[in-house]
Amino acid sequence: MRGGRMIITILDECRVEEKCQSCPFSQTSKCMEACPTDAIFLLNNKSFSCLTCGECARNCPNKAIKRNEFGGYYVDRRRCNGCGICANVCPIGIIKIVEKDGKKFPMGICSMCGVCVEVCPYNARVSSYELLNTKREGLAERYLKVLENLMKVKLFRAEEKPGKVVEKVERKSIKIDRDKCVGCLRCSYLCPRDTIVPDSIDACTSCNLCGENCPKDAIKDGEVDYNKCILCLKCVEICPNDALKVENFKVIKVKEDKTSQPTSYCINCGLCAEHCPSGALRFENGHLYYSPDVCWKCMECVKICPNDVRRIKQDFRRLYIHKGNLMPKASMGNNKLYSCESPVDDRVVGGCSLCEICINNCPEEAISITTVKLEKIKDENCILCGTCSNVCPRDAIIIDRSNGEVLFTDNCIACETCAIHCPRDVIPNTTGYKKVVDRENSFIRTDMDFCIKCGLCNKVCPNNCIDYGVIDKERCEFCGACYNICPTKAIYLHRKWKVKE
């Protein structure tokens, strides 16, 4: 079996000096010494390693061997019973069952941590992604062919995880220019699909819907010209925040002036339609269509929406009461009526169909339809923690630690779940909607019975707050780097997310 993601040796570069033949390291090498899982061996004075083909994981009866976020594999020692099946099925025989403290478990499985790449003095250890990106994939084929000949085995190409790395992913959606937006929230109030989520605001936002609906041009932004006003009350009815009311034959503004930008909006990723079991949502040519008559209100779309735009909204109707009796509004006369809102029904809202109503009605031309491009991330601020891959709903992200890159596969639909949760904000975020770890309801700890003191957690922690499994929880930001890199899954991580203020 041949692996999809793996670290290989450029054979012409490995141990190229003649003095290597008489070196005391002739039976070992720097990469072997550094590998925390003993996944590298020497053959004909060249380094070879685990193929990350996944045969061990597929044949493990206890499902104790699993793929991690970097394309390698880890052994969950709580599940492993040391049966040795993984060693028996390994096509190159690198897996060995060892015993420590009365517990048997396998060694020799690559976790794709990239340590061997860093310590190689000849730059001979590289990831298969680097070869692919530099159009040198032939070196990987040669490496595998030499291994076949030396070990006298046939290595067939294994089934890889669905999705191949792509240069970029594109998506069309509206975009609100936060620098131009004045916070009137007209876009939110006019959107027929409730797809632009307003901030909770109890004030007059100067949306001027009152002025646009006044037949006599008697009001603007809640300020009334009483010489023109005919008390038709269209302004009172249309005001989205109930900022206007009638007192003594005059329409008056009863709430303060305040502006606020939308908190989030639909980016047309199509995740909701993809997860809808009833067929009430369809995503066609970048447009999202919803038919409420076949909706089960199962909330799957609400749960999966990365921007929390898909949501339940309760419809109300205003009731007018006089002396305990319901009255039609038209019969107000001189009677003193009390009004209240009564819930009518719940409905699922949110989901942009690109109708452009928001674009055509924005007074500052702050909204446009744009093509968002998501390309591989190679940023010095990226800590390669793996959070993006953890939260991705389509398993479309690869963390290439050896090259310091975050890669996207053709499974990616640019839903930006990764960007919303990224602790370093290195992934483009269209809406600016952000979630952070809720520290009070999250926890991280290390089971020291399974920690092998390999030091990988020390190496990857961006805050230097872990020392061979011992975590300083006050400094920890719950980024998950140690959790994702741990080759024995000795680190437990549970994260709850909350919207960033």
Swiss-Prot record:
Domain 4Fe-4S ferredoxin-type: 39-70, 71-100, 101-130, 172-201, 195-224, 220-249, 257-286, 286-315, 341-372, 373-402, 403-432, 442-471, 467-496
One of the record's GO molecular function terms: metal ion binding
Matching Gene3D superfamilies: 3.30.70.20, 3.30.70.3270
Residues involved in [4Fe-4S] cluster binding: 50, 53, 56, 60, 80, 83, 86, 90, 110, 113, 116, 120, 181, 184, 187, 191, 204, 207, 210, 214, 229, 232, 235, 239, 266, 269, 272, 276, 295, 298, 301, 305, 352, 355, 358, 362, 382, 385, 388, 392, 412, 415, 418, 422, 451, 454, 457, 461, 476, 479, 482, 486
SUPFAM superfamilies, sorted: 4Fe-4S ferredoxins
Classification via PROSITE patterns: 4FE4S_FER_1 (PS00198), 4FE4S_FER_2 (PS51379)
A Pfam family that the UniProt record links to this protein: Fer4_7
InterPro entries for the chain: 4Fe4S_Fe-S-bd (IPR017896), 4Fe4S_Fe_S_CS (IPR017900), Fe-S_Ferredoxin (IPR050572)
Keyword tags: 4Fe-4S, Electron transport, Iron, Iron-sulfur, Metal-binding, Repeat, Transport
Name of this protein: Uncharacterized polyferredoxin-like protein MJ1303
Organism name: Methanocaldococcus jannaschii (strain ATCC 43067 / DSM 2661 / JAL-1 / JCM 10045 / NBRC 100440) (Methanococcus jannaschii)
